[in-house]
């Protein structure tokens, strides 16, 4: 499994504000969108290009445009939605899928309650989005669901990851590249990332 750590100064600056408990929902959403957008630069660095010609106001110019497979952004509900919004500003023609999972508070295992993907997901470059890679259970299940529907070469994007979550993905999906903004210390007894930033979904939507 390959891990790409996006440690750009702008990402780390915005991540500092995401971690701050004083940051309210509006600012948190905007920051998370911006971090996701900045992370996408690295996650999509290997997209294919082809040459074509356009007419500038002065003369014809040889330029490069995206080619190859079309893109799909797949959010793990609900927190992954905020990452979709940021990345869509860069690739507005990408299709969007949703996978609904919740974590059982006793076992910490994920439970699927919803899935809706582009019908041609097997023909697209898919990016699985979830701000927090904690135990890795939800991301692992989501990756399995994507593979069952023919998706290959899926990249997992998470703002924060715990070592336990990375180990789980390496074990279950060693062919997956994980793109993260930070790797934190550990999980606590409740399965939260330490030091983390709290419950991303609650902080995005102002819920408890």
Curated annotation (Swiss-Prot):
Its EC number is 2.4.2.9. Allosterically activated by GTP. Keywords: Allosteric enzyme, Glycosyltransferase, GTP-binding, Magnesium, Nucleotide-binding, Transferase. Uracil binds at residues 193, 198-200. It holds the Pfam family UPRTase. Binds 1 Mg(2+) ion per subunit. The magnesium is bound as Mg-PRPP. It comes from the Bacteria. It catalyses: UMP + diphosphate = 5-phospho-alpha-D-ribose 1-diphosphate + uracil. Pathway: Pyrimidine metabolism; UMP biosynthesis via salvage pathway; UMP from uracil: step 1/1. 5-phospho-alpha-D-ribose 1-diphosphate binds at residues 78, 103, 130-138, 199. GO terms for molecular function: GTP binding; magnesium ion binding; uracil phosphoribosyltransferase activity. Its cofactor is Mg(2+). Gene3D superfamilies: 3.40.50.2020. GO terms for biological process: UMP salvage; uracil salvage. NCBIfam families: PRK00129.1, upp. Catalyzes the conversion of uracil and 5-phospho-alpha-D-ribose 1-diphosphate (PRPP) to UMP and diphosphate. Belongs to the UPRTase family. This is Uracil phosphoribosyltransferase. It comes from Thermus thermophilus (strain ATCC BAA-163 / DSM 7039 / HB27). The gene is upp.
């Amino acid at each position: 499994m390959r891990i790409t750590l996006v440690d750009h100064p702008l990402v780390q600056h915005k991540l500092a504000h995401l971690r701050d408990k004083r940051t309210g929902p509006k600012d948190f959403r905007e920051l998370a969108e911006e971090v996701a957008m900045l992370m996408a630069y690295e996650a999509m660095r290997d997209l294919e290009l082809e040459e074509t010609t356009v007419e500038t106001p002065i003369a014809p110019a040889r330029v490069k445009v995206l080619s190859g497979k079309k893109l799909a952004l797949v959010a793990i509900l609900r927190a992954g939605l905020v990452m979709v919004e940021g990345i869509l500003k860069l690739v507005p023609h990408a299709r969007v899928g949703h996978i609904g999972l919740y974590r059982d508070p006793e076992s910490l295992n994920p439970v699927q309650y919803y899935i809706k993907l582009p019908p041609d997901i097997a023909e697209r470059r898919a990016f699985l989005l979830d701000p927090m890679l904690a135990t890795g259970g939800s991301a692992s299940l989501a990756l399995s669901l994507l593979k069952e529907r023919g998706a290959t070469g899926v990249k997992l994007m998470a703002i924060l990851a715990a070592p336990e979550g990375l180990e789980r993905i390496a074990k279950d999906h060693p062919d997956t590249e994980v793109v993260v903004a930070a790797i934190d210390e550990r999980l606590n007894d409740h399965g939260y990332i330490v030091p983390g930033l709290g419950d991303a979904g609650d902080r995005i939507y102002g819920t408890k």
